[in-house]
Swiss-Prot record:
Family: Belongs to the universal ribosomal protein uS11 family.
Main location: plastid
BP-aspect Gene Ontology terms: translation
Keywords: Chloroplast, Plastid, Ribonucleoprotein, Ribosomal protein, RNA-binding, rRNA-binding
Superkingdom classification of source: Eukaryota
Pfam families the record matches: Ribosomal_S11
Gene field: rps11
Keyword Ribonucleoprotein listed: yes
Name of the protein described by the UniProt record: Small ribosomal subunit protein uS11c
Compartments it resides in: Plastid, Chloroplast
Keyword rRNA-binding part of the UniProt annotation: yes
Subunit composition and interactions: Part of the 30S ribosomal subunit.
Any one GO molecular-function label of the UniProt entry: rRNA binding
Amino acid sequence: MTKAIPKIGSRRKVRIGLRRNARFSLRKSARRITKGVIHVQASFNNTIITVTDPQGRVVFWSSAGTCGFKSSRKASPYAGQRTAVDAIRTVGLQRAEVMVKGAGSGRDAALRAIAKSGVRLSCIRDVTPMPHNGCRPPKKRRL
């Protein structure tokens, strides 16, 4: 019997260097700015923090999911605190305005973390959208 000739290239493409947390290695390094705007979006399921420069261009963003929290832990106040610390430490802000949107549990914890981080806050605004009796709200859950 003749021996099978080994194939030089395999059909299956192998991704080299991609790990489970590949997002962190593929992310561009954040610009360092001294003055900016911190947007805190606190929903009932997650907390998202976006840091922009004064013109509104996004410099860095972080969420409870990217900080390593999964499922219901993303909605915790501790996740909001860690998210805020991660965003500020990466960018290196010194002066900032804070805009808070939403009524999630990470909202107050994120504000406390921003205040304790040493960033000088010029103003804190609540920009939560409030309807003037617009759309009908969804029906209440029956458990």
